[in-house]
């Protein structure tokens, strides 16, 4: 027999290896480490693994480069330092002083689960702004995912081929090395995410419900298989016990938050009582009235004192009588939309084009109520309009026309209402120059239903919840608000000028709040793409006499402030670290979207952050937002003056003679919001030197020691993730804004890259 045929025969005898079996099992053509094909033979998501070589030793070509980091680089972390002479920080509590004490050691994870196992300790860190700390890039050991709840390793972890004798077995039962799927493709993320959705029929827009079972395409095939292993016939990965529709092991089960062994989590926030019961008081489910969002204490005797806020959808919930609700319906009955439309339909959320503004050619068309838009294209080419140089800006030509349109209608409506103030005959008459009543236009109740509750009070009016019966036309993809199995809900904010407010000032505020919110929440609707999931959807603007009505998406879990206060009162603790990290990432993503389109919020605080029961976060209240770059501007323009609520205001805002970047102000405010989530109280009341002793202490320690004792004493579920978070906090809280980290870079830090979020952002355009 020729030599080459003998070698071939010998190779055939050795072909009964598990490598061939694995190729048959997963229908992979080649075995080159992780498979590039799914279980059905179609290309699956790429498994990105960063392989590094230690050039110091060629013999360790495939050995991970490991840098050991001491368990505690700073001995002061072992024992909290107590600073004498400082005011009691508990005075900054969001809750009464007689509430349960706050836990300083962080929320426990599980009695039988090691906290060190919950977060992978791998990372490639960004530049550390603290010169006293070691900011070298470190890589940790890649530990297999074990059955006791350890999380998978990060995709950037330095790993080498596994030559152990049981590596194939570990792959089959799911305990082998599997890449951490944070920020993977959306399809890959969804396949790996085990979902515990809302009760049947409930839906929150922007939240993608993943399938029950994870994907099989993530199981890698190996070329270094063992010899002589018996193998079964070809089966699908779904038939393996690991990939059956068996939910993952829950390692942390709280009333409001669940954590699973693969690292994903589920929020189970309470729904308002007003949503659980209809106007007749018929309960739709068994939610408790003491759901943690109602009847917040208020007063001067150590109880909750909110920062000044225009509105809150859940903060001051009070039950209202049927008579109050009937009066509200009577007022809303005559409300007329101020938005010009090219088409009227009976169901507002079933057609996206319904809310696309139709901009008229001249102001005479606006005053006459004409909806003629045939010359829109010609108007866009008008030489009097500056050339658009920033197509990503949220405020462009159409928004400018809508601003002029609404401002004119609001001014005329208020002027006419003032003249008819004492005329009883004008009680149910729409003011001249405002929205023109049309017998073909559907009534308010047909579009948004009837009032079921009054859930908020503010300086300019009240916030109500309206609901109507859900029908087959209310398809989920087009709907921009909350619904259950029977009804669809809308938040309705009434805005009425105070006697001391000039008409021009009130008109500017309404127009600014509506235009910014509407343009951001509908930015991608023009192109038929998915909109930003963390921006509250603004739907319509209507008028009745001197009252203006803004219709918005309804978030039935209330605002973040109410959640923090209720949690502190009920269990005496702030949010779980992983829960707060998820909210932090969503908040950063939402503000990143705003900044990418030329808008800074300038008033970020828990009262302006709304929540859905599944944990989906929504940013609201754009009344004080700053448009720092329009479609006609190439460069960012700064601003001056104090904006926002005191505990969240950045230090540079207190200098009236100096301009500041509003984007960096938002970053500072986000840091305060996060610390409030994990500590249960503000860091300080005022970030101006000489006005607050706590801020003075922070400033002096940062200047002398490059650290702040409050940040040093914070604890997370894992020492490494705690270190990464601490680095990010120091980058956020830079008193000098020129040294402060941006939102984009903050999302690239190791802390945020390790944070698993409820919303898959990979395929959502920025």
Swiss-Prot record:
Catalytic activity: L-seryl-[protein] + ATP = O-phospho-L-seryl-[protein] + ADP + H(+); L-threonyl-[protein] + ATP = O-phospho-L-threonyl-[protein] + ADP + H(+)
SMART domains: S_TKc
Pfam families per record: Pkinase
An annotated GO cellular component: cytosol
Gene Ontology terms for molecular function: ATP binding; protein serine kinase activity; protein serine/threonine kinase activity
Biased composition (Low complexity): 14-25
Subcellular location(s) per record: Cytoplasm
Protein's GO biological process: intracellular monoatomic cation homeostasis
InterPro entries: Kinase-like_dom_sf, Prot_kinase_dom, Ser/Thr_kinase_AS
The protein's Enzyme Commission number: 2.7.11.1
SUPFAM superfamilies in UniProt: Protein kinase-like (PK-like)
Family statement: Belongs to the protein kinase superfamily. CAMK Ser/Thr protein kinase family. NPR/HAL subfamily. HAL5 sub-subfamily.
The protein's name: Probable serine/threonine-protein kinase KKQ8
Organism (species): Candida glabrata (strain ATCC 2001 / BCRC 20586 / JCM 3761 / NBRC 0622 / NRRL Y-65 / CBS 138)
Record gene name: KKQ8
């Amino acid at each position: 027999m020729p030599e080459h045929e003998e070698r071939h025969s010998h190779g055939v005898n050795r072909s009964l290896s598990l490598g061939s079996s694995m190729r048959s099992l997963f229908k992979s053509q080649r075995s080159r480490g992780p498979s590039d094909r799914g279980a059905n033979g179609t290309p699956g998501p790429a498994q990105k693994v960063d392989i590094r070589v230690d050039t110091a030793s060629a013999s360790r070509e495939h050995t991970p480069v490991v840098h050991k980091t001491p368990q505690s680089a700073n001995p002061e972390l072992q024992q909290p330092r107590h600073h004498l002479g400082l005011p009691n920080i508990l005075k900054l509590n969001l809750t009464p002083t007689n509430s349960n004490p706050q836990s300083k050691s962080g929320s426990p994870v599980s009695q039988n689960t090691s906290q060190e196992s919950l977060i992978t300790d791998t990372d490639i860190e960004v530049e550390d702004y603290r010169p006293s700390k070691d900011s070298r890039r470190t890589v940790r050991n890649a530990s297999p995912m074990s059955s006791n709840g350890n999380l998978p390793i990060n995709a950037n972890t330095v790993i080498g081929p596994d030559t152990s004798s049981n590596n194939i077995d570990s792959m089959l039962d799911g305990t082998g090395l599997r890449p951490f799927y944070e920020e993977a493709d959306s399809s890959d993320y969804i396949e790996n995410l085990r979902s515990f959705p809302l009760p049947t029929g409930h839906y929150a827009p922007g939240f993608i419900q993943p399938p029950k079972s994870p994907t099989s395409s993530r199981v890698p095939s190996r070329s270094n298989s063992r010899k002589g292993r018996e193998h079964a016939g070809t089966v699908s990965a779904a038939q393996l016990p690991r990939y059956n529709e068996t939910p993952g092991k829950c390692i942390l089960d709280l009333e409001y938050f669940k954590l699973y062994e693969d690292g994903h989590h589920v929020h189970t926030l309470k729904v308002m009582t007003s949503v659980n019961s209809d106007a007749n008081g018929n309960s739709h489910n068994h939610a408790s009235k003491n759901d943690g969002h109602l009847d917040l204490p208020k007063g001067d005797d150590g109880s909750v004192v909110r920062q000044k806020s225009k509105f809150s959808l859940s903060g001051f919930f009070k039950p209202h009588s049927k008579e109050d609700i009937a009066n509200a319906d009577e007022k809303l009955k005559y409300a007329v939309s101020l938005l010009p439309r090219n088409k009227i339909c009976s169901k507002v959320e079933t057609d996206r084009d319904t809310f696309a503004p139709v901009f008229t050619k001249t102001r005479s068309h606006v005053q006459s109520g004409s909806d003629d838009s045939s010359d829109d294209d010609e108007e866009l080419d008008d030489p009097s309009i500056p050339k658009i140089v920033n197509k990503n800006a949220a405020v462009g030509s159409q928004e400018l026309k809508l601003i002029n349109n609404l401002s004119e209608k609001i001014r005329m409506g208020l002027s006419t209402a003032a003249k008819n103030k004492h005329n009883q005959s004008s009680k149910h008459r729409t003011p001249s120059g405002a929205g023109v009543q049309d017998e073909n236009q559907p009534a308010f109740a047909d579009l948004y239903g009837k009032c079921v509750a009054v859930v908020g009070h503010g300086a300019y009016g009240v916030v109500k919840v309206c609901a109507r019966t859900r029908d087959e036309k209310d398809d989920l993809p087009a709907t921009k608000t909350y619904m259950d199995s029977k009804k669809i809900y809308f938040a309705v904010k009434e805005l009425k000028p105070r006697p001391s407010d000039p008409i021009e000032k009130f008109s500017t505020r309404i127009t600014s709040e509506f235009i910014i919110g509407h343009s951001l929440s509908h930015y991608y609707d023009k192109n038929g793409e998915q909109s930003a999931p963390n921006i509250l959807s603004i739907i319509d603007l209507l008028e009745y006499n001197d009252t203006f009505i803004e219709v918005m998406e309804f978030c039935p879990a209330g605002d973040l402030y109410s959640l923090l206060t209720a949690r502190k009162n009920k269990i005496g603790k702030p949010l779980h670290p992983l829960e707060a990290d998820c909210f932090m990432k969503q908040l950063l993503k939402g503000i990143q979207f705003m900044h990418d389109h030329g808008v800074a919020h300038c008033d970020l605080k828990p009262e302006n952050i709304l929540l859905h029961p599944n944990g989906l976060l929504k940013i609201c209240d754009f009344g004080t937002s700053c448009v720092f770059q329009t479609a006609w501007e190439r460069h960012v323009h700064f601003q001056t003056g104090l904006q926002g609520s005191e505990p969240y205001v950045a230090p540079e805002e207190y200098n009236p003679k100096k301009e500041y970047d509003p984007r960096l102000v938002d970053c500072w405010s986000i840091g305060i919001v996060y610390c409030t989530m994990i500590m249960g109280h503000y860091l300080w009341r005022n970030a101006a030197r000489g006005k607050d002793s706590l801020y003075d202490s922070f400033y002096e320690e940062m200047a002398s020691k490059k650290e702040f004792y409050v940040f040093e004493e914070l604890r997370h579920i894992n020492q490494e993730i705690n270190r990464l978070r601490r680095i990010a906090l120091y980058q956020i809280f830079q008193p000098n804004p020129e040294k402060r980290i941006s939102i984009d870079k903050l999302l690239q830090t190791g802390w945020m890259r390790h944070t698993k979020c409820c919303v898959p952002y990979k395929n959502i355009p920025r």
